[in-house]
């Protein structure tokens, strides 16, 4: 179908040459480059690009994984990981204030066995996890240790293939 081909070509034009980051050499920039490399961002960028062109909205969730390491060139208790959240598998609930600033973000998913529904909500202050199983919902609230919503949200008004629909 034309829609799929339009998305493939647009993604190829946007991501065929990997993004190049530049900054003055520093330990922080080196660590940043290692995070990008270890998370295989070239592949993720392509997936994000494709999904936003298909669905008009996709999110990238960043989270720490506890693991004593020196992978980024400095001693750390954590590895930074990310996950692409597409409407194909997740329900996304961004919430904005009157100035279009993201003030909270929710993501809902169902386990592969369809036995649990998990809704996670992120604010600058806290991370909420609501788990529903067999009609019973449990709630867990943890402080958001980074003080920011750990999500990069990508949106566009219409899918890239909109003009061939009509």
Could you tell me what each predicted segment is?
Residues 1-79:
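Extended, helix-rich architectural segments
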Residues 52-57, 61-166:
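Structured, contiguous alpha/beta core segments that scaffold functional sites
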